[in-house]
Amino acid sequence: SQKVYDKAKENLDAFISRNILFRESKPCYYIYQLIMNGKSQTGLVCGSSVDDYENDLIKKHEFTRPEKEQDRINHIKTTGAQTGNVFLAYKNVDAIDTLINDWKKERSPVYDFIADDGIQHSIWAVNDAKTIGRITELFKTLVPVTYIADGHHRAASAAKVRAALGGENSPEGADYFLTTLFPSNQLH
């Protein structure tokens, strides 16, 4: 309902004004690790391309319902943000695994907390231009496709919002949507 979307916008605006959510000063990736019941999963948080979604480089395996897509579209339009994370899976690549694991070993997380549900969440910012370039190149050359594990409606809605905003001539942020990429060896 519009009331729910308005509350989401109010909450997002409050997080931004309190500097809980902020725009990084330069591009970065985030390494995200969650630990639940002694099992760890680590993925890479980034913006994935709407073009990749539309060109089937992000593989879908379920149909979406128009009313659920419209709900997500209304949320994006009201908040002015794509806040729903889409979880993508890919066939693991040793070089990417090593790079991510080395980054985690050599640095402290920028966020590390245990939520009320007992799940530990840790986040590392990858903000070194050379490392960002290496990660980007490894994905471009060694990960030809990803698969939607969760978030079919969120991904479809991101593509529809971009189309409504002018397609390839849309505002800069509309070309990407929030994703976390998990290698197959991290899926439990």
Give the location of each predicted region.
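A cross-family signal for N-terminal binding/gating loops and helix N-caps
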Residues: S1-H188
